[in-house]
Each structure stands twice: as structure tokens, then as C-alpha cells.
Amino acid sequence: MTTVRNIAAGVRSMTSNAFLADGERTVLVDAGDGFDAAARIEEATGGLDAVVLTHTHPDHVGNVESVVDAFDVDVWGFDPDHPLVDHGIADGDHLRIGDAECEALHTPGHKNDHVCLYARGAGILFAGDLVFANGGFGRTDLPEGDRETLVDSVEHLLETVEGSLDAMYVGHGPAVETNPRYHVELAAQAARMG
């Protein structure tokens, strides 16, 4: 069973959450920024197999280089041309994160290279900055942001998860482990209204 912990918990700087998924393949989903991620990974698991990025905004990738240096791992992300990304992820690709088989869902709107990672069998979603707890959704006023595209991405996510969702790990704020689909539905409604 995959254990997921937020190694950015308690950090008091402008960072994203950074989720360490432990299991068959120990993976860091987003690296955060402005704290010693490598030390927190070492303390939690003693090792790392890969980094996977939901997107490449600075608050999600600021610690990537120090993590790569500490653990000599490759980085996976949607944009293979980004200097921090070693391996491109395409929509529909499957990646092992912890013990879970995750499908990459290209979900632009907040940023063109945004992906969510959904493990149907485990009922786990790494949502990045697409949606948050309590109906929040990613900003669309930043470069590459587009509200209509974000709404389409949230609707695509709802169609994909079909109710088999037990935990949603988001880019900012608390994880959602009680009825996460409801929070995605709220985000879809809120994004449509704006």
C-alpha cells in the first residue's frame, strides 16, 4: 500500500506541497521550493527513485536540482523541453508512484504543461494546482493560464475518476481524504461561474 506524506508540511515560505509516495517505487510528486527537501526525504525514507512534476511553476520545482543532486534521480514531467525534465510524460502514460499505477492526465488551464496523476486501483489523485479542497481551483491569471481550458480539464478529470476516488493530494492546502470527488465537483462549479 502506498504511503503518501507531504514533506513540505510546516514550511513557512512560498512553496507547493511536495508529496513523497513510498512503496515499490519511492517518488516525490513536486519538489516544492525554499526548504531542504533532500533532508526531509532522507529522514522519511532514506532514498528516492524519481521525481514527477505536476507542472513547472517555480513553487513546484525550486527544490528539484538539490533533490536530483542528493539522490541522483531522473525527473518526469509533461514538457520534455523544460531544462529540469529528463523524461516527458504524455497524456495517458502510466507511471509507478509508490505501489500505485498512475495514469497521467494532461490538464492544462493553470499552466500548459500541467498533469494530474490518477491511480484508479488505489483511488489516489495527485491534482497539482488544477483543483484544491473546498472547491478551489488553480489560478488562470498567470502566463499560460486560461479559464475555459481549466474548466475543460476539470470536467475531463471528473469523467476520468468516475467516483472511484478516496484521496486527493493537492498542490496547496490540505489533502482531501473524505469525499474528494465532491471537492472536484465544487471546483468545476466555481470555475464555470467565473
Feature locations, PLM:
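Histidine-centered catalytic micro-motifs
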Residues: V51-V61, H106-D113, Y169-P174
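Conserved beta-strand hairpin/beta-sheet module of binuclear metal-dependent hydrolase folds
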Residues: M1-E42, C116-A133
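Conserved beta-strand termini and adjacent loop/short-helix elements that scaffold enzyme active sites
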Residues: I7, F78, I89-D91, L105-T107, ...
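Residue-level marker for buried hydrophobic side chains located in beta-strands
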Residues: V27-V29, V52, E103, I124-F126, ...
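Internal catalytic-core helix/loop-beta-alpha segment
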Residues: A90-Y118
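Haloarchaeal acidic low-complexity proteome signature biased toward cell-envelope/secretome components but also
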Residues: M1-M14, E43-G47, P180-G194
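Metallo-beta-lactamase
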Residues: G34, N112-A191
